[in-house]
């Protein structure tokens, strides 16, 4: 019964998409005709989703200039990573810097954390700790895993891929890149963003890191809300509101 309802929901969603095109450039008629494949993708196991994240992260790394460990960015990130830890709820975490002026950072379900040099130029280490704590929150709370599955479902519908065990090894580099891009560009709900903010606050306190950096990061990102478009918080709730929420938590001591 549960699977029948899921298949019906996918078919209904596909029908509602008629006349529209999503960010992956999928023809909606193709999406409708591939409803069964989307259903299979929706039942993708957590293990396969994380395997796809592993391959997708590697594909993203290959398409970007990664800062060396000996560079000023690499050394700064190593210090930040040591403070935050290399394991989140049992998931190993690895950190790298992409050399690009974009202001962004993201994390995938497999613990792949990437921060852009544009963000590091804009913020101090404590502020970056706050931002990365937020991204780790999406991993720990299952948000990243859900988005990886959703992104896979979209590409599966487009390319008629079935969700068989070990599917990651069957995907092309182009498909992996599309899935990864879809996952890291996900627009989370306000509730999920707030949950990740609170996770970051709690993580910083647990690790003995100042929570003021989280406030500072929001204040700096607030300056981008009405200007530059390539910001990690373009689709997030207003940064000013988020900064105030963290101030309130600091004041309450909780």
Where are these regions (language model features)?
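A Zn2+-metalloprotease active-site environment signal
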Residues: 2-8, 18-254
């Amino acid at each position: 019964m549960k699977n029948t309802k899921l298949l019906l929901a996918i078919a209904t969603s596909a029908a509602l998409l008629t006349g529209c095109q999503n960010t992956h450039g999928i023809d909606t008629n193709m999406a409708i005709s591939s409803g069964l494949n989307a259903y299979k993708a929706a039942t993708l196991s957590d293990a396969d989703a994380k395997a796809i994240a592993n391959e997708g992260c590697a594909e993203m790394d290959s398409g970007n200039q990664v800062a060396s460990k000996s560079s000023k960015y690499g050394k700064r990130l190593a210090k930040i990573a040591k403070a935050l830890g290399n394991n989140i709820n049992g998931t190993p975490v690895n950190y790298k810097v992409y050399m690009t002026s974009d202001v962004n950072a993201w994390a995938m379900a497999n613990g792949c954390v990437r921060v852009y040099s544009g963000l590091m130029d804009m913020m101090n280490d404590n502020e970056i700790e706050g931002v990365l704590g937020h991204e780790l929150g999406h991993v720990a709370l299952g948000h990243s895993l859900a988005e990886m599955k959703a992104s896979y479902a979209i590409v599966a519908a487009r390319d008629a891929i079935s969700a068989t065990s070990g599917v990651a090894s069957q995907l092309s580099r182009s498909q992996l890149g599309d899935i990864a891009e879809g996952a890291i560009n996900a627009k989370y709900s306000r509730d999920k963003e707030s949950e990740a903010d609170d996770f970051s606050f709690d993580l910083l306190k647990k690790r003995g890191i100042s929570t003021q950096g989280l406030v500072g990061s929001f204040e700096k990102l607030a300056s981008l809300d009405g200007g530059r478009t390539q910001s990690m918080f373009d689709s997030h709730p207003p940064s000013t509101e988020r900064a105030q929420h963290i101030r309130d938590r600091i004041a309450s001591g909780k």
